[in-house]
Amino acid sequence: MHLKSIRLQNYRNYETLELDFSEQTNVLIGENAQGKTNLLESIYVLALAKSHRTTQDRELIGWEADAASIEGRIHKRTGESVQSLSFSPKGKKAKLNHLEQRRLSDYVGAFNVVLFAPEDLAIVKGSPQGRRRFLDMEIGQVSPVYLHELNQYLKTLKQRNALLKQLSTKGGDETLLEVLTDQLIELAVKIVMRRYHFIDQLEKWANPIHSGITRDLETLTIQYVSDTFQKERFSKEQMFETYRQKFDKIRENERRRGVTLFGPHRDDFELYVNNRNVQTFGSQGQQRTAALSLKLAEIELIHEEVGEYPLLLLDDVLSELDDHRQTHLLDTMGRKVQTILTTTNIDGIAHETIQQAKVFHVKQGEVETESV
């Protein structure tokens, strides 16, 4: 699949913008704070209905504007489609081929992207929250029902925490707590099982990619980390019973503290290079290679699941990679996927993928196209 064109209205520092993209490589060149990342972000938002930079949709609306919109034309094997998002103080609306979608989970997944930004290099050594977000967003692209299940889980978790807090201060009937606990467990089992499957598939692709980058000197494995389930795998029924036993065991502790003490909202995953935890023991180079391997594996995983390669977004990441890793990434781009990347300068990047790219110059929210 590829993004043929995009139209922005009052999106961040863009009042109006219409661009047509190459099916292969597109380069956005400009100094910092001119709008390159904003443009890349708008494509990510078009696909996933949320930003990777902020949780506040209001920040996406331009200065002194009341609303913002993004519209993209996407070409897939099955034909061409139009996707659009609009944002206002009242909320956001998502449309597929001009039909409004009642749930965002019905919208997400129709257009797939993989974003690689400098902060993704820190996913290996960063916080568990960042890794959970990575899991949630990527699983949501290949399994949109996951986002619905996750939203239901978080809603139930919020209700359960509020009730636990009430019980810890005022006491009361625990009948509702039992109902919410059962609902939470059912959703938790679905979420964890989908995460296990995703981790297995991601590792299947990431390991050979990592071996290729390191010239067969390193192997990469991924381990899902849960305080409920160790390395062993369980059936759906076994997982439900294990959760139930643990909730029963810590019931008084949760009531006393007024909060849910475990579940997929606290889980994590770990990366191992040659059986050593790369988060703890890996060099910066190993951590960056692991992050690059994850991103390249995402591309292959999405292709396997949906039958088409996603769009690759690179936000000023080439300058963060050494020549060897840079070449490996550019080789992947040139062979398989439409790519849109940002940079302040392409001088010194001799790779044919860049030399043959469609180039856009970005300055103060204005974009000019250059032929190469």
From Swiss-Prot:
It is found in: Cytoplasm. Belongs to the RecF family. Pfam families: SMC_N. One of its GO terms (cellular component) is cytoplasm. It comes from the Bacteria. GO terms for biological process: DNA replication; DNA synthesis involved in DNA repair; double-strand break repair; SOS response. One of its GO terms (molecular function) is single-stranded DNA binding. InterPro entries: DNA-binding_RecF (IPR001238), DNA-binding_RecF_CS (IPR018078), P-loop_NTPase (IPR027417), RecF/RecN/SMC_N (IPR003395), RecF_2 (IPR042174). Gene3D superfamilies: P-loop containing nucleotide triphosphate hydrolases, RecF/RecN/SMC, N-terminal domain. ATP binds at residues 30-37. This is DNA replication and repair protein RecF. Disulfide bonds: none annotated. The RecF protein is involved in DNA metabolism; it is required for DNA replication and normal SOS inducibility. RecF binds preferentially to single-stranded, linear DNA. It also seems to bind ATP. Keywords: ATP-binding, Cytoplasm, DNA damage, DNA repair, DNA replication, DNA-binding, Nucleotide-binding, SOS response. Its main location: cytoplasm.
